[in-house]
């Protein structure tokens, strides 16, 4: 029985280890492993803040929204906005302040580490707290190894890409900072929404598209590394935390307006 539990833990955490190793090795000039691991742990700690925020959010959602609009708010705000915002804050407040954070690829590595740190703790919690038997736990762990965990990892790549462009790009820095949060929230929200409306098969289309895009992103960034060498990239833009908070408010406003529209259409 104890061996079975270890096997379930192994299945739940193996995709996390595989993905973070894959991304780390893609970097031609790897980051300090200790700093990446700390970022991973900070990503895992997100669950503590969610435990505080989610009850209030769920009360709000269940009070004002029903049916399809309730599912939309659950998907795009309760899950996507809260989780992706906290990941971005880890990237901003810790990783981007490091001396070694000196090129666009670093943003991808650290964003992915934060995302997979959260994915690891979420996966273990989900596997053991939403199932009643070890057989169910194993099945859930296996299913999430090919769905939820890759989603978090690939979303980290997307977030890191735009965050890196915001810091090191030559133009449109504010736009890229907005996209560093907006795009992962949109992808994450769509993923969760498909699950809640029992259209789970569509999530694999999302994952396939994300994987294809991520491969192109890696090739593009690695080519830039090869051309520039291990030369210091000068930051072209200084990000303020107030900008991130304002972007969160903008995205939240868009989500609430969209959910209200759904409420008026389907539940009026």
Label the predicted regions.
Residues 1-268:
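Hydrophobic alpha-helical segments at protein termini of multi-pass membrane proteins
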């Amino acid at each position: 029985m104890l061996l079975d539990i270890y096997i379930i833990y192994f299945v739940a955490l193996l995709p996390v280890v595989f993905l973070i190793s894959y991304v780390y090795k893609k970097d031609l000039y790897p980051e300090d492993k200790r700093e990446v691991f700390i970022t991973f742990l900070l990503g895992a700690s997100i669950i503590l803040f969610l435990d505080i925020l989610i009850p209030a959010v769920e009360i709000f959602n269940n009070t004002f929204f029903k049916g399809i609009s309730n599912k939309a708010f659950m998907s795009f705000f309760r899950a996507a906005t809260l989780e992706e915002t906290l990941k971005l804050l880890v990237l901003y407040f810790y990783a981007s302040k490091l001396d070694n954070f000196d090129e666009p690829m670093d943003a991808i590595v650290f964003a992915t580490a934060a995302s997979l740190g959260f994915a690891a703790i979420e996966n273990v919690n989900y596997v053991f707290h939403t199932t009643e038997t070890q057989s169910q736990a194993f099945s859930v762990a296996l299913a999430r190894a090919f769905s939820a965990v890759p989603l978090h990892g690939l979303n980290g790549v997307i977030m890191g890409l735009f965050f890196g462009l915001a810091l090191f790009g030559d133009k449109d820095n504010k736009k890229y900072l907005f996209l560093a949060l907006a795009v992962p929230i949109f992808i994450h929200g769509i993923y969760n929404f498909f699950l809640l409306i029992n259209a789970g098969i569509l999530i694999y289309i999302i994952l396939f598209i994300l994987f294809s895009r991520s491969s192109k992103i890696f090739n593009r960034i690695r080519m830039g590394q090869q051309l520039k060498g291990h030369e210091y990239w000068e930051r072209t833009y200084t990000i303020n935390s107030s900008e991130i908070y304002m972007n969160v408010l903008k995205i939240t406003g868009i989500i609430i307006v969209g959910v209200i529209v759904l409420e008026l259409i389907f539940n009026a």
